[in-house]
């Protein structure tokens, strides 16, 4: 049974979210409260401020699946980087082009109606990339596929993380 479902990681395949995240490096879940908060913060012009993270943090801490993954990262009030990205269909962005050696985590929060594509195990690969105008690095789709990273499509109709 594949753990990857359209609106979240399969609850049937995941009995321990922290162990699952440790193995796959990815966990996503549709969440209407998060979606509404993201939309509200965006409308208020505060989508990427430390204030926005504090608003989301309370609900994140109440979600047992996500809390088990994030709790060691939630001890600081201010994440290192808060960025906002819009739709950029056909582009694959990464934060790093080498396998992760530092203990860091990327938390995405999505507004209602978001569609996202992840690439399985891409965080374990070395890629060539170019600097993108949004501040991230862009990797060619052919390189990701050649690297054996299967596409995982997610639809966050209600929003999520």
What do these predicted ranges mean?
Residues 2-7, 11-24, 30-159:
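Non-heme Fe(II) oxygenase catalytic core, chiefly the N-lobe of the double-stranded beta-helix
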């Amino acid at each position: 049974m594949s753990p990857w479902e359209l609106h979240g990681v399969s609850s049937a395949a995941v009995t321990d979210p922290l162990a699952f995240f440790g193995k796959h490096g990815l966990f996503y879940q549709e969440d209407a409260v998060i979606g509404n908060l993201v939309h509200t913060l965006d409308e208020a012009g505060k989508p990427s401020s430390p204030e926005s993270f504090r608003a989301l943090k309370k609900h994140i801490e109440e979600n047992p699946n996500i809390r088990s993954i994030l709790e060691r990262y939630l001890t600081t009030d201010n994440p290192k980087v808060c960025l906002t990205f819009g739709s950029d269909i056909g582009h694959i962005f990464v934060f790093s082009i080498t396998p992760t050696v530092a203990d860091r985590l990327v938390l995405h929060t999505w507004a209602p109606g978001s569609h996202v594509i992840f690439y399985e195990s891409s965080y374990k690969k070395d890629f060539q990339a170019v600097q993108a105008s949004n501040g991230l690095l862009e990797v060619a789709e052919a390189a990701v596929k050649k690297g054996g990273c299967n596409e995982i499509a997610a639809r966050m109709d209600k929003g999520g993380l």
